[in-house]
Amino acid sequence: MPEKLDIVLWDDPILSKESLPIPPEKFGNGLFDLGRRMLASVGSDGIGLAAPQVGLSMRLFVMAIRDKKDKVTEEIVIANPVATVCSGRAATADEGCLSFRADGRLLYGPVTRYEAVDLLWQDPLTGEERKRHFDGLDAACVQHEIDHLDGIMFFDRRRMKNGWRKKLLKQWEKRR
């Protein structure tokens, strides 16, 4: 199993910056191996992880797609992603983040996401273009990870109405 990477917490400045595109010369075994290490770092309580969450400013994220029994059925390394279509109704569900945890537990809050996403990306080994339709939880994960690449945290997606962000941060401080 590949060596795990340390995951930075929500207040690390790299998480609020837009990530840089991966240039053609970076594609190959090194980029793919980084993706494998990121997948090893996701753990049992996550489904995705973006490069900024491991301290790297590059447009790369990984997903561990799970079945209804929560068993990983596929692992994907995604470089330079572009969501071409976000469709379906917008649904609100509780969402967590591997960079937003306290006492080893993820903190969750409601976030509104589209039900489906068509995604274009480059294969990390070859740089070849790939595309795929994602829906449900996988579509929410794609949107969450692209937000990380754009310097947006999941709590930034919520309106600051009713002190939701403040409440979440207070909860985080308490558990720290």
List each language-model region with its residue ranges.
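Positively charged
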Residues: 1-176
